[in-house]
Amino acid sequence: VVNGRLNGDRLNDEQLAAHALAYLATELEACRQLSAWAARVGGEFEGKVARAYVGELARNLRGGVDLGACENIALADLGLTDADLADTLLHPEVQAFSAAHSTGAIYLEIAQHARDKGFGNLGLDDEMLEEIRGQFAKFSDQKVIPIAQDVHRQDKLIPMDILEQMAELGVFGLTIPEE
């Protein structure tokens, strides 16, 4: 920061660290929101999903921030010390939490529940939103899923009739303010 503004040259020099910090901030917020959702809806399944996500992230971050191929940033490169890690990611309670809540058996339970009973309470708490969700699920099941694999594997464009039907559902106007 120079004169209260980000220094573009410095940011460019530290772009891997900046990318890692942005990733960490995003993951932290995802953990907060997922945990808040699970607490709000109060279901056992939803809590299991949130705990698995938090536990998996805590376990994965021990090795650094993995941003993709050839982009793994060591936590020390972000200024974290061994003492910082001992108090957080390497703390015995955090490791025990990860070991208890982010296992292959837990993931299998989550997948089986999702397959057999759905994805749990989405917490929409709005009849209209639930109806919209149902309409989109029906559209996806009837129109998208039957052609999705072919479109993907052959790298085809999404057929215009699908896009037109999506437009009729209001997809392309969802983010445009009414005024």
Predicted regions and their residues:
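Flavin-dependent oxidoreductase catalytic core characteristic
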Residues: 1-178
